[in-house]
Amino acid sequence: MNPIVEFCISNLAKGGDYVYNQLENDPGIDVLEYGCLQNCGICSSGLYALVNGDIVEGESPDDLLQKIYAHIEETWIF
């Protein structure tokens, strides 16, 4: 079983699409896209994703990508 990273489609339009595509190419991560993840306050203020149910935020697409990988390293039991 792989870590799961979930994106809101509205957040993809703000630069999250770059992160989504990078993660989609990683065979060790399952990436999902939803119409809405019910985190509208966070979504409207910046980039974020749910990583195994935890909110991970970034100031830029590269920052979000690094924080997602860091969160997986810190919390995922391989």
From Swiss-Prot:
Q: Which residues form a coiled coil?
A: none
Q: Tell me which HAMAP family the record gives.
A: UPF0349
Give the similarity note: Belongs to the UPF0349 family.
Name this polypeptide is given: UPF0349 protein SSP1836
